[in-house]
């Protein structure tokens, strides 16, 4: 068989395979998943050589992740429109806003997407906080005019809610519009300047929080969010959180 015949045969075979494959249609019948923590308990017969290599690094990781910071009275989770974990986190940012001598922020804001794990009930270790806030986000305090804070509330309503501090009461409609909002029990004044404690990531207008880019002044406190959280737990020793109606979706 000459070269041209071989090429022709290969092309015909390839075409047959392609036709056969494209003719088959696959449909997903079901999807199931479970969370499986990969720990040493899964390894019934650990490799001694691998263990010797890993052990020094494991010791370093354990020294970072295992220290106890305090206790949590309840398990905390994140979710819209309001949740125990986002409530606690937003309040912690307000608490941390005074670290460099600034006045206490009028409002704290965290994004649900930035809270990557749950807070356990009982003992809270440094590793738990690192899992909740694994990113290199830092605390900033923004000064904003009231009219722009109103726009920020529109941003929050448009995504169905984010984590806001205890000073905020926001009612949103089913179609994600602001029905009513107050800060510190008062309606927002267009000309007043408000201080917002939040993440530098959100301050750039990310996660639909575009109004934050209109801040008239920005104070970068330099502290990682997870460090702010850790210091708050150490300071308070026992933490707690509950649903307070900070963000409510109107029912028809």
Model-derived segments and spans:
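Bacterial N-terminal signal peptides
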Residues: 9-18
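Post-signal-peptide N-terminal segment of Sec-exported extracytoplasmic proteins
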Residues: 49-59
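Sec/Tat signal peptide C-region and signal peptidase I cleavage site
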Residues: 19-23
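Bacterial N-terminal signal peptides that target proteins for export
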Residues: 1-9
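Acidic/histidine-rich, surface-exposed loop or edge segments in extracytoplasmic proteins
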Residues: 63-80, 208-215
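Membrane metalloprotein/metal-transporter helix-bundle signature
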Residues: 35-46, 52, 70-73
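Feature captures C-terminal
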Residues: 25-41, 83, 87-252
């Amino acid at each position: 068989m000459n070269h041209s015949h071989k090429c022709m045969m290969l092309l015909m075979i390839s075409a047959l395979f392609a036709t056969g494959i494209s003719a088959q249609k696959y449909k997903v019948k079901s999807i199931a998943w479970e969370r499986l923590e990969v720990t040493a308990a899964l390894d019934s017969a650990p490799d001694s050589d691998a263990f010797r290599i890993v052990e020094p690094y494991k010791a370093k990781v354990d020294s970072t992740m295992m220290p106890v910071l305090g206790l949590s009275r309840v398990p905390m989770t994140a979710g819209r429109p309001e949740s125990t974990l986002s409530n606690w986190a937003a309040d912690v940012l307000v608490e941390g806003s005074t670290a460099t001598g600034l006045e206490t922020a009028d409002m704290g804001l965290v994004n649900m997407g930035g809270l990557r794990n749950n807070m356990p009930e009982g003992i809270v270790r440094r590793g738990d906080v690192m899992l909740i806030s694994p990113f290199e986000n830092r605390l900033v305090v923004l000064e904003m005019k009231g009219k722009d804070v109103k726009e920020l509330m529109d941003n929050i309503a448009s995504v169905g809610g984010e984590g806001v501090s205890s000073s905020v009461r926001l009612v949103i409609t089913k179609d994600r519009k602001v029905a009513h909002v107050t800060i510190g029990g008062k309606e927002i004044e267009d000309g007043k300047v408000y201080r917002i404690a939040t993440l530098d990531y959100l301050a750039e207008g990310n996660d639909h929080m575009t109004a934050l880019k209109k801040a008239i002044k920005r104070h970068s406190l330099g502290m990682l969010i997870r460090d702010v959280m850790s210091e708050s737990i150490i300071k308070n020793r026992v933490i707690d959180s509950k649903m307070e109606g900070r963000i409510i979706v109107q029912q028809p």
